[in-house]
């Protein structure tokens, strides 16, 4: 499924904005929910956080089977493509020309970016990915992490201030927990196996 949907992303010359919605016959619906651009689960446009998530998953595919040669360049292309959504922090959605539709900054895209940057650094040993990993963590530490009460803020406004427009409270833990674990696991392992392999865990 991943290779069919993503296998030529790095050849598309800019057509990396992934379609989010399809009908029952897998025909793309690029205008789905155009009248509800801020929908928290089915928004109009393309979601850069999902580009980052797919990039991370492609690297895990590469870790399981390095003969899937499409997976590494696809991950690199998607990771770099998400730069267009950094304003700073990743905006929730962009239109098909790359302009922001919903400029909310949610917590989960940066956690996916942290994992992707870490795995790319492991695989390529390129300094740009190590620097990206550190930059993303510094941004998260400054704006998303709630140092008074723990966990993360789940949404920031355009001025990077915490707000509660979409969710109230702190409804999600697994994204931020994963972000904290990436430094201890390899792209070749899932979280459980990776942590088992750590003798100090």
Each predicted region: which residue ranges?
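A glycine-rich, aromatic-flanked flexible loop/lid motif
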Residues: 23-28, 48-51, 82-90
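Intrinsically disordered, low-complexity N-terminal regions enriched in serine/proline/glycine
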Residues: 9, 15, 21, 153, ...
């Amino acid at each position: 499924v991943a290779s069919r949907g993503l296998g030529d992303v790095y050849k598309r010359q800019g057509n990396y904005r992934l379609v989010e919605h399809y009908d029952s016959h897998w025909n793309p619906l690029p205008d789905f929910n155009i009248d509800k651009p801020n929908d928290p689960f089915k928004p109009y446009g393309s979601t850069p956080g999902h580009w980052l998530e797919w990039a991370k998953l492609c690297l895990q595919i590469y870790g399981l089977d390095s003969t899937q040669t499409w997976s590494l360049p696809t991950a690199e292309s998607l990771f770099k493509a998400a730069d267009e959504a950094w304003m700073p922090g990743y905006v929730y959605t962009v239109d098909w020309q790359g302009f922001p539709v919903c400029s909310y900054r949610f917590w989960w895209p940066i956690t996916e970016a942290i994992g992707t940057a870490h795995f790319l650094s492991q695989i390529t040993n390129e300094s740009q990915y190590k620097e990206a990993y550190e930059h993303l963590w510094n941004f998260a530490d400054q704006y998303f992490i709630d140092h008074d009460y723990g966990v993360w803020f789940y949404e920031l406004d355009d001025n990077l201030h915490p707000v509660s427009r979409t969710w109230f409270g702190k409804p999600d833990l697994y994204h931020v927990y994963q972000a904290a674990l990436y430094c201890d696991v390899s792209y070749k392992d899932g979280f459980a196996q990776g942590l088992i392999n750590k003798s100090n865990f």
